[in-house]
From Swiss-Prot:
Residues 6-25 bind DNA. Keywords: Activator, DNA-binding, Transcription, Transcription regulation. This is HTH-type transcriptional regulator SkgA. The gene is skgA. It comes from the Bacteria. Residues 3-72 form the HTH merR-type domain. One of its GO terms (molecular function) is DNA-binding transcription factor activity. Pfam families: MerR_1 (PF13411), TipAS (PF07739). Regulates the induction of katG (catalase-peroxidase) in stationary phase.
């Protein structure tokens, strides 16, 4: 049976050493053995458990729920894989629709065809947006209701190009911040501060007004508290949610 060190496990899976250490610390993925030299050693069963963790992350399952699912008595790996395949297939179908919308929107912008406005949002999940808004109102009350109304009022006049740029900038910010995380950059370093400056502007555009430092820091707390945000960021890079939140608070302190 093959045995892997934490570095070998990281290279094999694409999961960072830092994330594997974190999974060990919270009990989500303990190494099969720890040598006298302090090295962690993993076997194939650990590989399969890590694969399960990654499948759950792809399905936006919070880490605490992943651990509960994997540690339940009588856990059946084959049954879990079949259920995950069904859910991933449904997601693949939805993403295929989104790709089609992207292609048709690009064709419209480039003048190759005319796209009816009613088709702009095919493939998006209105139920998820409704859940997100309900969570905000439940946890933040009237202030959240006002913020949602302001955001919707500001976005009402957006055209296709506005939406495309807004979404692309969000992805670019997440990508660049995940890269900074993997490089081990401090949250108050110059490169991360530059990313947060872009995020500050992005949030202001979303809210239809510039955020206050307290509101920006509070949004960082929300990212950690809301399971859908957490699932999104952890799927990009393990530890990104906490890093994102800390970077936002560091930036807010400097305003």
């Amino acid at each position: 049976m093959s045995v892997y060190t934490v570095k070998q496990m990281a290279r094999l899976s694409g999961v960072s050493v830092r994330a594997l250490h974190h999974y060990d610390a919270i009990g989500l993925l303990k190494p099969r053995a720890v040598g006298a030299n302090g090295y962690r050693y993993y076997d194939r069963q650990d590989l399969l458990r890590l694969q399960q963790i990654l499948f759950h992350r792809a399905l936006e399952t919070p880490l605490k729920d992943i651990q509960a699912a994997l540690d339940q008595p009588g856990f059946d790996l084959a049954a879990a894989l079949r259920a995950q395949r069904e859910r991933l297939a449904a997601q693949a179908e939805r993403y295929a629709r989104l790709v089609d919308v992207v292609d048709r929107t690009l064709a419209d912008l480039e003048g190759d065809e005319t796209m009816d406005d009613k088709h702009l949002f095919e493939g998006f999940d209105p139920e998820k947006q409704a859940r997100h808004e309900a969570w905000l109102v439940e946890h933040y009350g009237d202030e959240a209701t006002r913020r949602i109304a302001d955001a919707k009022a500001g976005m009402k006049s957006w055209g296709k190009k506005d939406w495309s740029q807004f979404q692309e900038e969000a992805k670019a910010i997440e990508h660049d911040l995940a890269k900074a995380l993997t490089q081990g950059l401090p949250v108050d370093s110059a490169p991360v501060t530059a990313i947060m400056r872009r995020h500050w502007a992005w949030v202001g555009r979303s809210w239809n007004r510039e955020p206050t430092p307290d509101a920006f820091a509070g949004l960082g707390h929300l990212y950690q508290a809301n399971p859908e945000f957490t699932a999104r960021y952890e799927a990009i890079a393990p530890g990104l949610t906490e890093y994102f939140s800390e970077a936002m608070r560091a930036f807010a302190r400097g305003r």
